[in-house]
Amino acid sequence: MLAKLSRERWVVSNRDAEVRRGRSTRGGRSGGRAGRPAGSEADLHELRPAGEPGREPGGGRPVVAVTGAARGLGHALVSRLADGARIGRVIAIDDHRGDTTGVTWRVTDVRDPALAGRLAGVDVVVHTDLDLAPETDSRQRRTFNVRGAQTVLTAAAAGGVGRVVLVTSAMVYGARPDNPVPLAEDAPLGADQDGSVVGDLLEIEQLAQRSVRAQPGMAITVVRPAALVGEGIDTLITRHFEAPRLLTVKGSAARWQFCHIDDLVSALELAAAGEVTGAFAVGSDGWLEPEQLEELTGLKRIELPAGLTFATAQRLYRAGITPAPVNDLHFVVYPWVVDCEALRAAGWHPSYDNAAAVGVLLDQRAGHHAVAGRRLGRKDATITAAAGAGATVAVIGTAAIVRNARRRRRS
């Protein structure tokens, strides 16, 4: 799912390149799946701050504050902003001081209501301080993520900030076997509201919608990256590639789109400067077919019935064996490719294509072994691989083998 924008504690197919840039392979642009209430997405896509679009109040280069600036995505972003020409001044906010120079450090917890005082003189806030780690207790994680976003929005409004940039994920669109490929940026947010990381991000999206209506003088930008890869990125998606097999379900095929953290940082720079507004997606152009992914990774696929896969995954989650709800498994077996139209219109292009992103992911996985999203020691990983169990939920593969053997004996 999303990256661990952590608290440490956070090639396109050669076939039909025209279609892959902007049209669905299933008829419509984005489909019309029932999702959020009509009009809610339009609020985010159409909102602009008072005055000229893309310019913060007062004119000139904006003063930008970045939360979570001492680590992960936030650290990468403040480093880029400090070296760039788009931003006038960078305020780095975290619960401890980081090592980036050329910025002003303000040490505070993003959940502290006193944050408003730390935003004095700030034009734009980019909120990256999220805990999306697979092993974090779900209730603690949600409290941190949702309360943090809520405090940032409230403090920004109280402090007269002109724009807040929130980072969620393209996963909020949901992964479905009938998803258009690609999804349009204004497609309904169809992910399930549950106890997963995606549930946290949906709550943050809802906070953004409410802020749009309650604070018309403050613009909200929401950035939704595809599956993140890069240094320090640790998610259930990246762990899918640490397993001995790639899981697929019968009758459906995932298409794979990635977003390198460097590309996300460059997109956030544009958002901070007001050059891209509203809600938009970021990722590599196009997508990879299952056969391409298998060739690039050297991992074989294991195909299982959908009913068996999801029922077994649900039992494993309830038993505390796997770290994520069953709905998270949808994101490795169903498509959720997004069309990054807004960034293209702004002249932005990714530095990494999907094949290059997979190469980075494979380099990062060296020495790691995962089953059902849970990291294993070397001995356990060897046993798992020998058992032939596949992909994100290796135990599901074992269950399928046992069930098929029983059927053969009965016949």
Where is each model-derived feature located?
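Amphipathic terminal alpha-helices
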Residues: 39, 44-46, 353-411
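A hydrophobic C-terminal alpha-helical subdomain
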Residues: 307-349, 377-384
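Alpha-helical substrate-binding/gating segment
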Residues: 238-248, 253-288
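N-terminal Rossmann NAD(P)H-binding glycine-rich loop of SDR-like oxidoreductase domains
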Residues: 58-83
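Mid/C-terminal beta-alpha module of Rossmann-like enzyme folds, strongest
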Residues: 267-326, 368-376, 404-411
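NAD(P)H-binding glycine-rich loop region in Rossmannoid oxidoreductase-like domains
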Residues: 23, 107-147, 155, 159
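Conserved Rossmann-fold NAD(P)-dependent oxidoreductase catalytic core, especially the SDR/UDP-sugar
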Residues: 151-196
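Active-site Tyr-X1-5-Lys
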Residues: 193-221
